[in-house]
């Protein structure tokens, strides 16, 4: 059984106000680009998104499967998955979509959900739950 965390782009009122005030700001462009991410510079874009404090850890899952990313994607999109053994929802979350990050807490490996499939990141994602 492996434990995974899911980070999703979640904007508080202050970030929404910043985007509405200046939709061409670096933070706004980073947020929008992450929702349309393609194969170019994914690691740099993810790092910038964390720098702008846009990602939030929303969920922790324990999964038993050789196809954990598929199971997680299906589960996060409302499909019943017998391979998900435990779920901790840390905050209200949307379904899984492009730009969301899944991290295996044991190996430290992270993947970004892409328009088609997954991109393995070459960077470490913080998986500690803040007190």
Set out the residue ranges of the language-model regions.
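Short linear interaction motif-like sites in intrinsically disordered regions of transcription factors
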Residues: 32-33, 51, 56, 112, ...
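Short, conserved turn/kink motifs that form compact alpha/beta structural patches or helix kinks used as
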Residues: 40-103
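Intrinsically disordered, low-complexity segments enriched in small/polar residues
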Residues: 5, 29-30, 48, 53, ...
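Short, compact, well-ordered microdomains
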Residues: 91-131
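N-terminal intrinsically disordered, low-complexity, charge/repeat-rich segments that act as generic
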Residues: 1-41
């Amino acid at each position: 059984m492996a434990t995974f965390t899911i980070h999703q782009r979640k904007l508080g009122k202050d970030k929404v106000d910043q985007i509405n005030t200046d939709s061409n700001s670096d933070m706004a462009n980073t947020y929008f680009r992450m929702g349309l991410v393609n194969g170019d510079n994914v690691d740099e874009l993810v790092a910038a998104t964390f720098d702008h404090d846009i990602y939030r850890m929303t969920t922790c899952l324990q999964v038993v499967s050789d196809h954990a990313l598929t199971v997680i994607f299906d589960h996060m999109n409302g499909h019943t998955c017998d391979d998900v053994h435990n779920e901790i929802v840390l905050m209200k979350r949307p379904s899984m979509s492009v730009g969301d990050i899944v991290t295996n807490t044991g190996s430290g490996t992270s993947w970004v959900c892409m328009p088609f499939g997954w991109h393995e990141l070459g960077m470490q994602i913080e998986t500690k739950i803040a007190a």
